[in-house]
């Protein structure tokens, strides 16, 4: 899918839709079943693009719109990881160890990104191509194409290091799969044609991001202050990465819902919101697979409540409630729903889940 510049419609402060992600999580293996459950776990066999890397980039250049640069250039970096060149075998963490056999003997060279995707909101719906997330692509583009994204080169110019031919050869096509941590979406404002405070982390990108516009949140809030429930964002992220990087296998390495730890015990255990969150995101992930995205698997964050690097013990992502004083672990409603989802046994639908209790 080609990158597209912000057009004349974007002048005056156009807003976009941006999918944000965080941290690396545990793998909960998906079991193939019928319907969209199997679509989530299975790799798509159709919709493969036949463009080579150079051809795809050339077409992307030709699809530029008149006007300024892409409104969103970089996002926040929480974590990026990349293994060495093929042949240097490193032990995978337990959560990914099972993937080695799936690679049919190839080295497990991979990269994990916290991926932000954007839609331009002022062009026709059918033209809502995803705008490049410059932070994630500043790692992926050199690996796949041997150079930084065009927007980075245009804005940062001589401040960017130059890759030698030897470095380009060393970098290119050394990845077997891409891991995406995907949780939410945010609005992104173009700061090339609109006044913005640029003393933020994203300031060099000439972009301003927020989860609220004109007093309205982009989605239902969660305990994680910058994460909102926007299920369609996972499909957007997967489809963009799949198209840009020539159908490299994609794993959703994190996706999950957070609760406040001071929530009463009954609501913590009967976590209806988490069940609805998982249903929504898996539905859109299934849609991406059906459209041809090469999705190899899905990892839910997280199996149990844990210490979060930013919020400590004040928020809970787990399918299992943990009493941190006694270490007792209690399955939540979401744990039982997810078990049924993986095994294909009587998954509760949207109308039933609101009345279902965790002790059922």
From Swiss-Prot:
SUPFAM superfamilies: (Trans)glycosidases (SSF51445)
Annotated positions binding a beta-D-glucoside: 183, 254, 301, 308-309, 317
PANTHER family linked to this entry: BETA-GLUCOSIDASE 16, GLYCOSYL HYDROLASE
Name the record gives this protein: Putative beta-glucosidase 15
EC number per UniProt: 3.2.1.21
Glycosylation sites: 346
Biological process, per Gene Ontology: carbohydrate metabolic process
Gene: BGLU15
One Pfam family hit: Glyco_hydro_1
Alphabetically ordered keywords of this record: Disulfide bond, Glycoprotein, Glycosidase, Hydrolase
């Amino acid at each position: 899918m080609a990158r597209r510049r912000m057009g004349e419609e974007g002048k005056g402060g156009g807003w976009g839709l941006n999918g944000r992600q965080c941290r690396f999580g545990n793998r909960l293996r998906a079991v193939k079943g019928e319907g969209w459950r199997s679509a989530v776990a299975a790799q798509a066999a159709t919709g493969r693009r036949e463009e080579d890397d150079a051809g795809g980039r050339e077409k992307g250049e030709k699809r530029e719109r008149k006007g300024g640069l892409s409104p969103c250039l970089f996002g926040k970096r929480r974590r990026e990881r990349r293994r060495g060149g093929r042949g240097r075998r490193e032990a995978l963490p337990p959560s990914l160890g099972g993937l080695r056999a799936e690679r049919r003997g190839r080295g497990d060279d991979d990269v994990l990104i916290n991926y932000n995707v954007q839609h331009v909101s002022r062009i026709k719906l059918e033209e809502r191509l995803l705008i490049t997330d410059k932070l994630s692509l500043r790692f992926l583009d050199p690996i796949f194409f041997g150079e930084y994204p065009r927007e980075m080169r245009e804005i940062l110019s001589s401040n960017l290091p130059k890759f030698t031919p030897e470095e380009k050869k060393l970098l290119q096509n050394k990845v077997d799969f891409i891991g995406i941590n995907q949780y939410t979406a945010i609005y992104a404002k173009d700061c090339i044609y609109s006044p913005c405070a640029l003393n933020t982390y994203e300031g060099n990108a000439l972009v301003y991001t927020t989860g609220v516009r004109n007093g309205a949140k982009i989605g239902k809030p969660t305990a994680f202050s910058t994460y909102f429930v926007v299920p369609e964002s996972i499909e957007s992220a997967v489809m963009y990465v799949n198209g840009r990087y020539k159908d490299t296998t994609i794993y959703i390495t994190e996706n999950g819902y957070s609760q406040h730890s001071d929530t009463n015990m009954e609501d913590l255990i009967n976590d209806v919101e988490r069940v609805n969150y998982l249903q929504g995101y898996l539905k859109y992930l299934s849609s991406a697979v059906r459209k041809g995205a090469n999705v190899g698997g899905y990892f839910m964050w997280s199996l149990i409540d844990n210490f979060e690097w930013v919020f400590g013990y004040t928020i809970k992502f787990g399918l299992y409630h943990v009493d941190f004083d006694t270490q007792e672990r209690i399955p939540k409603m979401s744990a039982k729903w997810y078990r049924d989802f993986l095994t294909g046994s009587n998954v509760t639908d949207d109308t039933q889940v609101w009345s279902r209790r965790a002790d059922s």
